[in-house]
Amino acid sequence: MSSLEISSSCFNQETKLPLSLPLVEGSTFEPPGKDMNEVEEKSKDIIKFTSEKLSVDEVSQLVISPLCGAISLFVGTTRNNFEGKKVISLEYEAYLPMAENEIRKICSDMRQKWPVRHIAVFHRLGLVPVTEASVIIAVSSAHRAASLEAVSYAIDALKARVPIWKKEIYEESSSSWKRNKECFWATSD
């Protein structure tokens, strides 16, 4: 008897699961080993800065857990306009040691406020063309309320605390560095 397989890989480990399991009439399926309620899984915080294009699928796969019924995502993309000017791309720079440290603190804050399992924060550096993602935040939790609230907190905290700078590049060959209005440590002009 042949069965279809679904293949999933994460951290260079591949797992194959049968699409459906054959059952004898009157029998029930019980997974081998531990009861599903006894599954132990270490929580993880995954932080990445890259000049490569970001993938929503890749980031969301990193936070999947058999203990979770919810994954919430925030995807920030480059829009094509600002105050009547046509934007062709954004350019991001960061002070990486401090940026990573601040994001780790944000992850810790999230864990104190909500019962979340896994957190992934990916941020693009360099040029980000219109419609492409500049930031993806994914959070998994047992229930949706925690992951939705946590992901909203994460993007607000990231914009307020993390040293990442954005330059808007306009169609008419001009550009402008932008300050996050939420950023607590930036001085006002």
Swiss-Prot record:
Its EC number is 2.8.1.12. Coiled coil: none annotated. The keyword Phosphoprotein applies. Gene3D superfamilies: Molybdopterin biosynthesis MoaE subunit. It catalyses: 2 [molybdopterin-synthase sulfur-carrier protein]-C-terminal-Gly-aminoethanethioate + cyclic pyranopterin phosphate + H2O = molybdopterin + 2 [molybdopterin-synthase sulfur-carrier protein]-C-terminal Gly-Gly + 2 H(+). Keywords: Cytoplasm, Molybdenum cofactor biosynthesis, Phosphoprotein, Transferase. The modification Phosphoserine is found at residue 20. InterPro entries: MoaE_sf, MOCS2B_euk, Mopterin_biosynth_MoaE. It is found in: Cytoplasm, Cytosol. The keyword Cell membrane does not apply. Substrate binds at residues 143-144, 159, 166-168. One of its GO terms (cellular component) is cytosol. Its main location: cytoplasm. One of its GO terms (biological process) is Mo-molybdopterin cofactor biosynthetic process. Catalytic subunit of the molybdopterin synthase complex, a complex that catalyzes the conversion of precursor Z into molybdopterin. Acts by mediating the incorporation of 2 sulfur atoms from thiocarboxylated MOCS2A into precursor Z to generate a dithiolene group. Belongs to the MoaE family. MOCS2B subfamily. HAMAP family: MOC2B. This protein is produced by a bicistronic gene which also produces the small subunit (MOCS2A) from an overlapping reading frame. This is Molybdopterin synthase catalytic subunit. It comes from Bos taurus.
